[in-house]
């Protein structure tokens, strides 16, 4: 049997034509968002607070600790936050402890850090009432990268990149000298940089790194300095030649590279450093040049000339101590915080610290007072004197007392630099050994250090030098092994750190000028800068997007989107082809098809269907492990491993292939990938196999049936256009699907899922109540309602519901007539009835663009590929009038209109909502309630009043006549201006709801706003000429004609065609999938079945023939059609079938626009552009040329002057028309005046002499010209 009948959810069954023996369940498609945010709450905040704690005052007297944090409960739930236009957030508090170092006094308090926006269960954020999504950013991982530069000769560049901190780079000049750069500063010779690390002689450098001709060249050019001189020179390069003492230079370099607060690799950076610098990763296929001695036994572990293959390297992994050596001693180790110079001042014996005598006087620099004389016994009292005056003391030892450092602990931590060193050689083309090469790696055990170490730097220099000896390999920056995702958790962590650094500085400044007794923790701490940064991130970051809520697929795709743009990412304008292009490592991780068309192409991608991220945020994808069966044959097991791009490199991974029933391979050789290359491999060498054919594409792309028959660019359009589908009034799932429709609907967040199993005890359009089995005996008023061991059935559940036992009931509120971000309708409909039993995670409602638990973006319609009177020329589409009458493509849209009353300045008047609107008829206010607000359910059209509002103008100086009239007729002394909210031009519909907020009701409103009224108007949009519809294969078009049913072509049985498509739209576009879908669709419709044809693994030609035969249709998929106008058959057979067509959001009603009188731009005084500004149509340069061509001088003059920006001419023309006079000659256009002013601003003298008056018109103001114009009239 070629197919299996599979049930998707509880409502839909499809005939699935997949040939795979295994079917791996898709992971949760939005967990990438929710899990990351949960991790941020659990670990991210704690780590940041730990990093900044304690904050210490400049004089060391006060310390502020952040011990713990907690989140308060949100004040408003998700629904309330949306209704009130506020952010769904929780207040983040921390337990702060202020400690006085001298007196050991402590003050504690819970302080508010910020209001933290919370993620919703569907992976979104509610910011100011609107749903937003923070998309993931793909960036280069911190780590070490070696790249090859091609010039006249090959050169290499090395970059040591942290997550936060100074970069280190090595490069080769045109003259072959080697240089190093720290923090993008000026270059320093590499040998001097090596000298800074503790190598003070040429011999020591050569014995450590071995002979390298380029390093030797650098050593000959630059004289080796001692270590201190090298450190001073490195500091001067970083500070533009500034010379400082060696201890200051050493301390600065220490803080730059080895201080955790300024240099951070994160766990991912340490992982990448260790991966790259492992000595055993570099020596494969080389020969050992020297015996390896086991230090434990003093015996030879490996003899020289041993060929280092994978097996030998595995042995070496457990004997790293055989090749671990100290390269730099503790005294010269740049990483040691306490150097030899400081240690000479102090006695290291802990018992004798108080007997230490100071060798020099300690002086207060500010006053010159001797605080402690030399040879004074150091007691606790003396130490307190040092602490109190610490900011005026420069002595090194006193500084360490002041900062309360534990000298002994620091001394204990002092150690030398250890590295793994192996000496190897390789063979030349003739098989002779080349000179010995020293390969140095870092210490792999230092996984906990998240800053760079001297061992790392030495190993990176060795790797760089080894590249010139053909050992090691360069990196592909675009490989996904070198790029990782920054998820919402990490992005928020970065923003938090940025805000806390600013706050830390402010707190330090306050601590330095405050006394412990006069301050409280709350007065000291101010995190307003953090709150501002968090708000800015969610409101205006390039990674925080206004949620695409038009349909469930658009929502889901946006949550799984990956962007290379944004802070710390790539600039769109400077991104080249290489970074936009598809890389072989993208396989099954990033979709090769779905990306935007336009300037962002290749920079924004989507995760593949099965992709997820590991703990370092590298993208992983699952593979099935290939094992040997009892007969020793390779067999696909059920064990799944998730692999990153780096881990895939060493495996042989087969593409999905057909298997025998026992999961062994049918062929001896199959297509597989190794090291990014695809080829034929023997099945014995296969280690993994893909879990599914659809794992290489994204969710949107995998919903396109017959994807494998479409050109890639058309598939891209198909995937993108599905996200633009408008939810229809009557949705219908596709007859021809791919089987993923159910999962898209379930994970999108648009539907309601049952939290627990139970019986439905109440269901209507507003809410659903599910009663679960109680976990204990229920007793009410001494009456046992339910015993724990009893069988639980619907009758018991109904009793519990009637008795209001809320502990075992879950209520689900349905969304009714809500407005989406794109102004479409969000409506949830119950799928369950009273008495139904539901399991946990079952879908209990349908939502927008879903039908019976499946995605339903469009409708299944009968299509024919034929021409009809030229109306479907150039992708135009002809549709049946039935599609309009029967609401097949009707959609509902909701518009929001808002008005506020504000507190105006004193004397400026008052704003109020009222029904008493001046100068309007009773008809205009008939639908307003007593407050002056439109009644829900009213039908409104363009210009109707929605909310009556008047603004009473401030007191004005009245004439004697006005005062007399007011006294006689009793009028108020101020005028009222009508400022009502009206339906805008071109809009209308039925008032769906009204929301009223006011400060009197204690609603949250901006300070100057008293009332806020929102009116929601719903309107049905039927499909019409000019609307855009499309299939799922990139086949799109605009409706050019709506034909009556009687004029349309019809089949032999009288069935009329719904849509006529142009057959010329198929061959050149190479999207043959639409033809196959059409044939399969009509066959499935005849058989009254639904089909699932998964991508790359669906219905093939043989299957299609069998289905067509089963449906008793012609094998060529064509049939005779009859002309509806004449009844005569068309000359030849026509391809007819059923295709799934969707209505796109590009509707003609949003674009149709006309202008009679409208606004003008302030500067140029030309008509505004665009529909929103009631603008005119631009008459541009090319249009002017066309009038030139016809010699239409008068029309051209009118268009360029009085119809555009000739202000005086406009007024004269209006006056002439109203008085029946001939049109006057035009004046100077305002744009010409602006141009002349620009020339004058450049210092040029401009004249425009009037031939009659001989005056310079440019120097005259517009007012003068207007006066002159009125005098002429």
Curated annotation (Swiss-Prot):
Pfam families, A to Z: RNA_pol_Rpb2_1, RNA_pol_Rpb2_2, RNA_pol_Rpb2_3, RNA_pol_Rpb2_45, RNA_pol_Rpb2_6, RNA_pol_Rpb2_7
One GO term of the biological process aspect: DNA-templated transcription
GO cellular component terms, semicolon-separated: DNA-directed RNA polymerase complex
Signal peptide positions (record): none
Quaternary structure (record): The RNAP catalytic core consists of 2 alpha, 1 beta, 1 beta' and 1 omega subunit. When a sigma factor is associated with the core the holoenzyme is formed, which can initiate transcription.
Gene3D superfamilies: 2.40.50.100, 3.90.1100.10, DNA-directed RNA polymerase, beta subunit, external 1 domain (2.30.150.10), DNA-directed RNA polymerase, subunit 2, domain 6 (2.40.270.10), RNA polymerase alpha subunit dimerisation domain (3.90.1800.10)
Protein name: DNA-directed RNA polymerase subunit beta
Keywords: DNA-directed RNA polymerase, Nucleotidyltransferase, Transcription, Transferase
Family to which this protein belongs: Belongs to the RNA polymerase beta chain family.
CDD domains found in the cross-reference section: RNA_pol_B_RPB2
Enzyme Commission designation: 2.7.7.6
Catalysed conversion reaction: RNA(n) + a ribonucleoside 5'-triphosphate = RNA(n+1) + diphosphate
GO-annotated molecular function: DNA binding; DNA-directed RNA polymerase activity; ribonucleoside binding
């Amino acid at each position: 049997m070629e197919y299996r009948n599979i049930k998707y959810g509880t409502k839909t069954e499809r005939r699935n034509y997949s040939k795979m023996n295994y079917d791996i369940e898709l992971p949760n498609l939005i967990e990438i968002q929710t899990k990351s945010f949960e991790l941020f709450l659990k670990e991210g905040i704690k780590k940041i607070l730990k990093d900044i704690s304690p904050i210490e005052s400049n004089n060391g007297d006060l310390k502020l600790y952040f011990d713990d944090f907690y989140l308060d409960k949100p004040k408003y739930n998700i629904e309330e936050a949306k209704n009130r236009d506020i952010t769904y957030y929780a207040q983040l508090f921390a337990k702060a402890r202020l400690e006085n170092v001298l007196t050991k006094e402590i003050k504690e308090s819970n302080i508010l850090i910020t209001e933290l926006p919370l993620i919703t269960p569907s992976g979104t954020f509610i910011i100011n009432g609107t749903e937003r999504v923070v998309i993931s950013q793909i960036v280069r991982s911190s780590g070490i990268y070696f790249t090859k530069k091609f010039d006249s000769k090959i050169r290499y560049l090395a970059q040591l990149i942290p997550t936060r901190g100074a970069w280190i780079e090595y490069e080769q000049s045109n003259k072959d000298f080697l240089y190093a750069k720290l923090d993008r500063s000026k270059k320093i010779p590499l040998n001097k940089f090596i000298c800074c690390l503790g190598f003070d002689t040429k011999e020591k450098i050569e014995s450590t790194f071995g002979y390298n001709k380029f390093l030797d060249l650098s050593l000959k050019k630059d004289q080796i300095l001692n270590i201190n001189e090298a450190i001073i020179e490195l500091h001067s390069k970083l500070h533009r030649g500034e010379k400082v003492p060696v201890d200051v230079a050493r301390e600065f370099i220490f803080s730059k590279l080895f201080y955790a607060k300024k240099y951070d690799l994160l766990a991912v950076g340490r992982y990448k450093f260790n991966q790259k610098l492992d000595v055993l990763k570099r020596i494969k296929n080389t020969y050992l040049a020297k015996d390896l001695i086991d230090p434990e036994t003093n015996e030879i572990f490996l003899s020289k000339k041993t060929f280092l293959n994978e097996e030998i390297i595995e042995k070496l992994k457990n004997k790293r101590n055989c090749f671990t050596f100290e390269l730099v001693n503790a005294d010269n180790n740049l990483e040691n915080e306490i150097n030899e110079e400081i240690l000479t001042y102090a006695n290291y014996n802990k018992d004798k610290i108080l007997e230490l005598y100071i060798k020099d006087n300690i002086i207060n620099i500010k006053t010159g007072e001797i605080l402690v004389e030399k040879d004074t016994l150091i007691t606790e009292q003396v130490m307190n004197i040092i602490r109190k005056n610490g900011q005026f003391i420069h002595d090194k030892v006193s500084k360490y007392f002041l900062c309360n450092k534990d000298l002994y602990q620091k001394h204990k931590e002092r150690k030398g630099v250890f590295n793994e060193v192996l000496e190897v050689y390789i063979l030349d083309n003739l098989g002779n050994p080349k000179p010995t090469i020293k390969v140095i790696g870092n210490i792999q055990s230092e996984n906990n250090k998240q800053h760079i170490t001297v061992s790392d730097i030495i190993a990176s220099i060795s790797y760089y030098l080894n590249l010139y000896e053909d050992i090691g390999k360069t990196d592909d920056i675009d490989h996904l092994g070198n790029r990782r995702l920054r998820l919402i958790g990490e992005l928020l962590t970065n923003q938090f750190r940025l805000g806390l650094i600013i706050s830390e500085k402010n707190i330090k400044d306050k601590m330095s000028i405050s006394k412990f007794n006069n301050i409280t923790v709350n007065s000291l701490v101010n995190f307003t800068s953090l709150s501002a940064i968090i708000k800015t991130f969610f409101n205006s970051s390039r990674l925080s997007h206004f949620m695409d809520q038009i349909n469930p697929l658009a929502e889901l795709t946006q949550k799984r989107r990956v962007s290379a743009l944004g802070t710390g990412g790539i600039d769109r304008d400077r991104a080249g082809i290489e970074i936009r292009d598809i890389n072989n490592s993208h396989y099954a991780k990033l979709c090769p098809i779905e990306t935007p068309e336009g300037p962002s192409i290749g920079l924004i991608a989507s995760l593949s269907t099965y992709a997820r991220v590991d703990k370092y945020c590298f993208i992983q994808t699952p593979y099935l492990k290939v094992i040997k069966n009892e007969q020793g044959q390779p067999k696909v097991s059920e064990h799944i491993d998730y692999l990153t791009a780096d881990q895939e490199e060493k495996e042989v991974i087969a593409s999905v292939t057909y298997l025998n029933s026992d999961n062994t391979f049918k062929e001896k050789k199959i297509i597989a990938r190794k090291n990014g290359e695809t080829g034929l491999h023997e099945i014995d060498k296969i280690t993994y196999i893909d879990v599914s054919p659809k794992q290489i594409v994204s969710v949107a792309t995998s919903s396109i049936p017959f994807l494998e028959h479409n050109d890639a660019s058309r598939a891209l359009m198909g995937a993108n256009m599905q996200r633009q589908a408008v939810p229809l009034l009557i949705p219908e799932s596709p007859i021809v699907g791919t089987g993923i429709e159910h999962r898209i609907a379930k994970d999108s967040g648009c539907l309601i899922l049952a939290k627990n199993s139970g019986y439905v005890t109440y269901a209507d359009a507003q809410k659903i109540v599910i009663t679960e089995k109680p976990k204990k005996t229920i007793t009410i008023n001494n009456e046992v309602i339910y015993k724990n061991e009893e069988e639980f059935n619907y009758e018991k559940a109904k009793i519990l519901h009637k008795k209001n036992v809320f502990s075992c009931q879950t209520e689900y509120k349905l969304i009714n007539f809500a407005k989406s971000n794109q102004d479409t309708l969000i409506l949830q409909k119950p799928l369950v009835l009273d008495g139904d039993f539901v399991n946990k995670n079952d879908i209990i409602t349908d939502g927008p663009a879903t039908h019976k638990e499946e995605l339903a973006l469009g409708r299944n319609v009968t299509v024919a590929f034929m021409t009809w009177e030229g109306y479907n020329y150039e992708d135009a589409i002809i549709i049946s009038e039935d599609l309009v009458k029967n609401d097949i493509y009707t959609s509902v849209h909701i518009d929001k209109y808002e008005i506020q009353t504000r507190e105006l300045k004193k004397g400026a008047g008052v704003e109020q909502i009222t029904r008493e609107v001046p100068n309007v008829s009773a008809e205009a206010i008939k639908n307003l309630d007593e407050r002056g607000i439109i009644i829900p359910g009213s039908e409104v059209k363009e210009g109707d009043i929605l909310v009556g509002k008047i603004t009473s103008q401030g007191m004005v100086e009245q004439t004697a006549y006005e005062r007399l009239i007011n006294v006689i007729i009793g009028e108020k002394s101020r005028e009222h201006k009508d400022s009502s909210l009206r339906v805008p031009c071109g809009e209308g519909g039925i008032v769906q709801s009204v929301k009223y907020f006011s400060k009197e009701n204690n609603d949250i409103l901006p300070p100057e706003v008293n009332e806020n009224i929102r009116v929601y108007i719903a309107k049905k949009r039927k499909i019409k000429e000019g609307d855009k519809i499309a299939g799922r294969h990139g086949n799109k078009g605009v409706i050019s004609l709506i034909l009556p049913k009687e004029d349309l072509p019809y089949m032999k049985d009288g069935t009329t065609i719904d849509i006529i498509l142009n057959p010329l739209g198929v061959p050149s576009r190479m999207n043959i999938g639409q033809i196959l879908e059409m044939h399969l669709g009509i066959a499935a419709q005849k058989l009254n079945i639904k089909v699932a044809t998964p991508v790359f693994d669906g219905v093939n030609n043989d299957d299609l023939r069998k289905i067509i035969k089963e449906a008793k249709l012609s094998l060529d998929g064509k049939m005779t059609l009859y002309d509806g106008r004449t009844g005569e058959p068309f000359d030849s057979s026509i391809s007819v079938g059923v295709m799934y067509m969707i209505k796109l959001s590009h509707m003609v009603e949003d674009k149709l626009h006309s202008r009679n009188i409208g606004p003008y731009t302030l500067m140029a005084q030309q008509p505004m552009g665009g529909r929103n500004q009631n603008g005119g149509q631009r008459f541009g340069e090319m249009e002017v040329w066309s009038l030139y061509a016809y010699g239409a001088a008068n029309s051209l003059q009118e268009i360029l002057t009085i119809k555009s920006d000739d202000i005086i001419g406009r007024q004269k023309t209006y006056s002439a028309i109203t008085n029946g006079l001939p049109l006057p000659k035009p004046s100077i256009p305002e744009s010409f005046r602006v141009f002349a002013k620009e020339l004058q601003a450049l210092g040029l003298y401009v004249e425009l002499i009037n031939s009659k008056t001989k005056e310079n018109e440019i120097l005259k103001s517009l007012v003068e010209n207007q006066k002159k114009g009125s005098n002429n009239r």
